[in-house]
């Protein structure tokens, strides 16, 4: 079915690596001519339906009728890629909310610290804990709690920019990472506080959940669940992720101790 077709007929214009397909394939063929064989991953585009298919391609230099030729064998990697994506998601994302987990949060915080050191800009971490979560679980069970946590994740995601991160650390604890906020402490503090206030406002709105119990008609419940927020800025010279998170955590507990449903700012050392 592919007889007479060129690589640009069988590939998207750009590979997942970001390289243009045609010149990249030429580079691979040059390797084959030199080494005799080359194996690589390639995104193919099906001729019949235009869908892209991940594949492993092995190209070997051969002789055909006493003339040099190349033989390509192709293995479909779709199932393997789906499996790898599942493993990646289990490793880096919270199963309940689909938010980044603690491990991915620390990866992104480390990247943010490196960027902050290069750019001279401040970042911020907002640590939050829900104020009235346990009574919901006690009264209505874990299904209601799970539904509320999922909604908390959605509300938090709407409060931040695309380049920022919301992660679930576990239980009813979440953390927000704001990157390259501003190049001076005063402006960065003001901007980060605006985000924290938006979070405080959005999480304080009533939660309405539908519980479907044992096949019966769904029962709607309404619950109020504010949050206590601890916020800290990290300057360009800081490099300890654990210290930053502990500082935000202490500020969060200070907010709890001062009556809940508020923001406390940890001073930058």
Regions found by a protein language model. Give the residues of each.
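PAS-associated C-terminal cap
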Residues: 75-88
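Terminal output helix/cap of sensory domains in signal transduction proteins
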Residues: 4-43, 193
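PAS/PAC sensory module
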Residues: 38-43, 49-58, 71, 228
């Amino acid at each position: 079915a592919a007889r007479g077709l060129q690589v640009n007929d069988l590939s998207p214009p750009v590979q997942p690596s970001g390289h243009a397909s045609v010149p990249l394939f030429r580079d691979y063929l040059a390797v084959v001519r030199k080494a005799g064989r080359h194996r690589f991953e390639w995104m193919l585009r099906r001729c019949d339906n235009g869908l892209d298919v991940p594949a492993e391609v092995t190209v070997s230099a051969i002789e055909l009728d006493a003339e040099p030729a190349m033989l390509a064998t192709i293995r479909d990697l779709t199932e393997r890629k789906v499996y790898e994506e599942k493993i990646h998601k289990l490793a880096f994302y919270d199963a309940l909310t689909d938010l980044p987990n603690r491990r991915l949060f620390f990866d992104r915080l480390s990247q943010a610290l490196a960027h902050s050191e290069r750019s001279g800009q401040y970042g911020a971490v907002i640590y939050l804990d829900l104020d009235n979560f346990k009574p919901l679980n006690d009264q209505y069970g874990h299904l209601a709690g799970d539904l509320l946590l999922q909604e908390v994740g959605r509300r938090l995601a709407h409060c931040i920019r695309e380049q920022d991160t919301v992660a679930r650390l576990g239980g009813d604890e979440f953390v927000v990472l704001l990157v390259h906020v501003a190049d001076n402490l005063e402006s960065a503090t003001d901007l980060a506080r605006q985000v924290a206030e938006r979070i405080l406002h959005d999480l304080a709105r009533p939660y309405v959940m539908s519980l479907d119990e044992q096949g019966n008609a769904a029962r709607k419940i309404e619950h109020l669940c504010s949050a206590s927020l601890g916020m800290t800025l990290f300057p360009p010279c800081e490099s300890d992720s654990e210290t930053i998170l502990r500082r935000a955590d202490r500020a969060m507990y200070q907010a709890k101790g001062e009556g809940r449903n508020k923001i406390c700012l940890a001073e930058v050392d």
